[in-house]
């Protein structure tokens, strides 16, 4: 499997009967959430027992050019009638979803091994499960409570984003999100309701609101819409995601933020996205920004690793080093602050589900401190939106300009970096990569 040669992150655990790790617990939550919807999730592990990838059982993705041959190969016997071929669902031009129910090889990994040997690697792949959780994704930690009057950090920039539309595909928007001034006017599909200190905060409720808050702080007058797509313990199958993204393109966004992703079988690109780019290229100017994952590895994390995507890693709290949890490598385009950010969150009681705080209960009052490349990505998405409104560039042009700036101010041993508006130790406002002030980052009296 693809994980044989990866550099593993510090939180990954095995399936050898030892105390559950963060990843083990998140896998169980995702498997249970999909099972409630009648969908079985397969768990592929590396030879050492660590997680390799998650996938939807009983279906595979197949390139259309090979579909007739693969479908015939999967018949239970050579004498099966044509009507007994596995059922097919067209997904996007170039790729189809093929059911393995009743086929010769009903289990995904077994079927793919046989297809690889017969037709070649990459003809068919699993429909991988992508996630906003620490299962090869983000955030890197569970949220920490902060006082109710805590201000967002990074705080709002000076204007920016006027006339720009940011689309956030995530877990949804909290009903009371616009109680926070920087989120006023943000729209979207609602997260499960909370609102009183005693009410439980479910799963990754609040993740989408936090992401939207970070983006809005960088582009305070942008139009932001949050779609509740990752509603199964913060996870979604790749073939469902590309359908949602296709619908999003029809709304005409300038920037799409995707704070989710995953690793794949044999580290191959997500097959559904390979064909999605054919649709994407017809929508001039829109840019997709995605988080690079929190596994502290250089293993490709998809879809951030695609060249068509702005893949965002996280800087540490001091903003001068890579965050310990952030993925890295040549496929990461830029690093931005993602450690200890503060923004809008749910109100209610949160029970920790991951080590080292399993079972502890904390009460949140509409704000939280959270870490992960999940939150570095919307910071960059917001900077792109702010630049669009300032320069008249479209999304892809603005992203290209900012990435050039990021390379020019790279940190040795880290890579290209972007910073938000901030203040120096002297209290002066320093320059921001969104362009709200001129000069290089760090221009102040310090």
Label each residue range with its predicted role.
Residues 2, 89-99, 103-165, 177-180, ...:
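Protease zymogen maturation seam
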Residues 14-126, 132:
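Inhibitory N-terminal propeptides of secreted protease zymogens
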Residues 120, 285, 308-311:
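Glycine-centered tight turns that cap/initiate beta-strands
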Residues 141-223, 243-251, 349-353, 357-365, ...:
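Active-site core segment of subtilase-fold serine proteases
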Residues 170-172, 301-389:
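Extracellular S/T/G-rich loop segment that most often corresponds to the catalytic His/Ser-adjacent loop
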Residues 215-236, 240, 393-409:
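Short helix-loop-beta-strand segments that form the rim/entrance of peptidase-like active sites
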Residues 230-306, 363-378, 445:
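Substrate-binding/access-modulating region of protease and related hydrolase catalytic domains
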Residues 249, 253-261, 267, 271, ...:
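C-terminal subdomain of the subtilisin-like protease fold in secreted/lumenal serine endopeptidases
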């Amino acid at each position: 499997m693809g994980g044989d040669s990866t550099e593993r992150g510090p939180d990954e655990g095995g399936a050898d009967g030892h105390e559950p790790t963060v990843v083990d617990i998140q896998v169980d939550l995702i498997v249970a959430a999909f099972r409630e919807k009648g969908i079985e999730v397969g768990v592929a592990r590396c030879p050492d027992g660590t997680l390799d990838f998650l996938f939807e059982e009983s279906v595979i993705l197949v390139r259309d050019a090979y579909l007739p041959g693969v479908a015939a190969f999967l018949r239970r016997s050579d004498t099966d009638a044509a009507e007994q071929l596995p059922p097919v669902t067209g997904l996007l031009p170039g790729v189809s979803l093929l059911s393995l129910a009743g086929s010769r090889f009903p289990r995904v990994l077994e079927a793919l091994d046989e297809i690889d040997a017969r037709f070649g690697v990459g003809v068919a792949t699993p429909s991988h499960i992508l996630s906003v959780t620490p299962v090869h994704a983000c955030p890197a930690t569970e949220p920490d409570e902060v006082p109710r009057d805590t201000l967002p950090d990074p705080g709002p920039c000076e204007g920016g984003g006027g006339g720009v539309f940011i689309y956030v595909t995530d877990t949804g928007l909290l009903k009371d999100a616009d109680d926070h001034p920087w989120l006023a006017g943000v729209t979207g599909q609602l997260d499960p309701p909370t609102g009183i200190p005693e009410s439980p905060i479910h799963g990754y409720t609040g993740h989408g609101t936090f992401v939207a808050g970070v983006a809005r702080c960088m582009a305070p007058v942008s139009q932001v819409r949050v779609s509740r797509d990752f509603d199964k313990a913060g996870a979604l199958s790749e073939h469902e995601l590309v359908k949602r993204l296709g619908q999003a393109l029809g709304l005409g966004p300038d920037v799409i933020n995707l704070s989710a992703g995953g690793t794949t079988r044999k580290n191959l690109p997500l097959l559904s996205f390979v064909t999605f780019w054919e649709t994407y290229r017809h929508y001039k100017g829109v840019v997709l920004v995605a988080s690079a994952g929190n596994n502290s590895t250089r293993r490709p994390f998809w879809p951030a690793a695609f060249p068509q995507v702005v893949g965002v890693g996280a800087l540490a709290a001091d903003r001068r080093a890579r965050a310990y949890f952030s993925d890295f490598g040549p496929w990461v385009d830029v690093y931005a602050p993602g450690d200890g950010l503060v923004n809008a969150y749910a109100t209610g009681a949160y029970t920790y589900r991951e080590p080292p705080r399993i079972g502890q209960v904390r009460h949140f009052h509409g704000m939280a401190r959270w870490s992960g490349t999940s939150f570095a990505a919307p910071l960059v998405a917001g900077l792109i939106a702010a630049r669009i409104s300032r320069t008249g560039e479209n999304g892809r042009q603005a992203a290209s300009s900012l990435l050039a700036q990021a390379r020019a101010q790279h940190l040795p041993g880290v890579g290209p970096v972007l910073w938000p508006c901030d203040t120096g130790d002297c209290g002066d406002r320093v320059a921001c990569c969104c362009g709200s002030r001129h000069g290089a980052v760090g221009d102040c009296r310090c």
